[in-house]
Structures are given as structure tokens and as C-alpha cells.
Amino acid sequence: MHVIVATDGSKQSLDAAKRLKSFADPSKITAISVVAVIRPLAAVAFADDLSGGQKTPADRDTSGFRAAAESAMATIAKEFDGWGPKVHQRLRSGSPANEIIKTARQLDAGLVVVAAGGRGISETVLMGSTAQRVQHYAPCPVLVVRPKPRKKKS
């Protein structure tokens, strides 16, 4: 089975990859494709929660988006080092939900893993909208990993 693990560069997407590892049998997975999607003419930069690097003005252009996406994919791919299945990194451009779904179809994926509530223009209004669209239209089962509950202030 080919598994797609989508990342938007958020810590939630890393948590989703770790969740897959926590229950899946690596001998049943033939390959993992880590997919990042950059949006053309994006108003919001690709998340960079995983690299820990400092942002510079140059990082805000499209090459910065690409570098952040590649860094996020590398971080997720590293999570699967030595686990078993071969890992591929696939950078796409377009609508995140559409590109994730298209990749799942092209690769005949058996599972798509996405985080709910990653990054977006408004995290409160669009919380999980990519995950919802992927869940609704993907050609295979979808594992949606919700963020850890926030601690309530006393």
C-alpha cells in the first residue's frame, strides 16, 4: 500500500506522521510519499514550524516558500528513516486539497494522512478545510489527525 503523508510545514503535520508510525505495520506499506503543496501567488507563506530557522526578507518570496516546503518534507521524511518503506518527497504547486487528492489518484494510494488545523489564512475560520476536502474527495481512506487539545487556563 502506498501512503501519502501531507505536510504544510506545521508541527501538526509532523504529529500526523508520528501517529501513522504509532499504529501502522511498515511491512504492509510499500512506499510513503511526503507531499507539500505551495500555492502560486500565496498571500500566506508556507509554514516553517519544523525547521526552527530564522526568517529573512528573502524567505518571503517564492523561492523561500519552496525552500520552506522542501525543509518540511525533509523533516517528515526523516521521521520515517529506518522504519521500512521507501520514502519519496513530492513538491506540488496549486490548491493543497486538489494536489493531495490528485497525487493520491496518480499513485493509487491506499491511505492519505493529513493534519486537521494546520496553517492557513485564518486558522479559526479555515481550521481543517484542506483536511475536510481531502477526506471528502480522496479516492482512498483518509486519516485526519486532530491537534492536541489546548490546556485550559486556570
What are these regions (language model features)?
Residues 1-55:
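Small/aliphatic-rich secondary-structure junction motif
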Residues 16, 44-47, 101-102, 124-126, ...:
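Short, well-ordered secondary-structure micro-motifs
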Residues 22, 105-106, 136:
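Solvent-exposed polar/charged
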Residues 33-35, 88-92, 143:
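General small-molecule cofactor/ligand-binding pocket signal
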Residues 36, 115-117, 146-147:
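Short secondary-structure boundary segments
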Residues 54-71:
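A short acidic, glycine-rich active-site loop
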Residues 77-112, 150-154:
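Structural beta-alpha unit
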Residues 111-137, 151-154:
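Glycine-rich, Arg-bearing micro-motifs that act as flexible, cationic patches
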